Every structure is written in C-alpha cells, then in structure tokens.
Amino acid sequence: MNESDAKHWLSDRVSRETMDRLELYHTLLTRWQKTINLIAPSTIDSVWVRHIMDSAQLFDLASKPAHRWLDLGSGGGFPGLVVAAMAKDVCPNLTVTLVESDIRKCGFLREAARQMDLSVKILSRRIGDVPAQTADVISARALSSLSNLIGHARPHMTPKTCLLFPKGMSYVAELETLPDDWQVNAEVIESVTDSDAVILRFRGAHLEGEG
C-alpha cells in the first residue's frame, strides 16, 4: 500500500472536512519533524500509511457510544489526534485525552490541535502520575509491552472499558505474559496497513474481584 492508497482509503470513510484536518496535520507533522523527533525518520515518507491510516483504523474498533477516549504515550499524536479529527463531525461528545511526558511533543500536540480546531485534553506528565480518568476507550501505540500497557491502563478502567493496542507478530508471546489476576479474552484483529501486525482489543475486561 502506498500513500495515495492510504488517502483514498481514508477519503472513503471520512468527510471532506476531516480529510482537510488530516492534510493539515500531515503538513504540521512534517514541518515540526525537522526540529523534534515526532516519528521515526524512516517513516517520514509513509506518514499516511504508517501513522495516519494505521491510527484511523482504531476509531471504528472502539466501543460505541464512547464519551471518554484516553490515549497513553501520544508522542506525535498517534492515534489520539487522528481519533479526535475523525470524531469531531460524527462523535462531537467524545472527549479525547492525550498523555505525553515530553514537553516539546506536547507543544506540538497543542499547536496541531489548535490549528486543526480540535478540542482535546493534553496531559503533560508521566503516565503513572495521571489521575484516574474513567475512560470508555484506552489506546496506546508503539509504547510498551502488553503487560506494561495493561498496568498503565488499570487505574483508568471500568468493567466496560475497551482497550485497543496495536502490536506486531510478538503479540502471541506477549499475551502469555498477562498478569494472572486478569480475566480477559483478547480479540485479534488484522491490521489494514500491515499484514504482520494486529490490533488487540479487550472489551469488558476487569480485574478479578472487581465489578
């Protein structure tokens, strides 16, 4: 899949206004990338496929209706800003919160959100220092191991929270490392951008002994 294919895939699924926001996001990202390492340099020529489309696929996998989306370790805004851009027209009541400890990246996130006219919450702090958010959806992309991701997500979950974690082919081994106190069933969904990648979705997950 090339960049043109990715843009076509997106344009079939979102409004013209949303595409305009994503185009602006792409422009801002490539501009800021010259001074801040927002994405891996090797992916700068494939932003639409590797980052924007890869993030956009999570939007349709989330539980509906969702009112609070928490994106952990947002980095350059993936998937958080993409989700917010897609939600603006179709899910205006969705609050997207982006957590990022790097102050410079937070500066980019705030400026991108401002120019894209997105109302998002940006928390510039370490994940472990974030107060409980009671999220309907929690996402994390290219952040940490699955067991660590679940540890990060636990304070913000309810029994109905949907977890969305993109993973590579190591996901099978990672699933085997889940804490014993978790009673979860993972849905393994093939990524639309990479045949060697999946999205792990957990729905209705809860800690043993909790409601």
Curated annotation (Swiss-Prot):
Its EC number is 2.1.1.170. One of its GO terms (molecular function) is rRNA (guanine-N7-)-methyltransferase activity. Transmembrane segments: none annotated. Pfam families: GidB. Keywords: Cytoplasm, Methyltransferase, rRNA processing, S-adenosyl-L-methionine, Transferase. It catalyses: guanosine(527) in 16S rRNA + S-adenosyl-L-methionine = N(7)-methylguanosine(527) in 16S rRNA + S-adenosyl-L-homocysteine. Gene3D superfamilies: Vaccinia Virus protein VP39. S-adenosyl-L-methionine binds at G73, F78, R141. It comes from the Bacteria. Its main location: cytoplasm. It is found in: Cytoplasm. GO terms for cellular component: cytosol. Belongs to the methyltransferase superfamily. RNA methyltransferase RsmG family. This is Ribosomal RNA small subunit methyltransferase G. It comes from Jannaschia sp. (strain CCS1). The gene is rsmG.
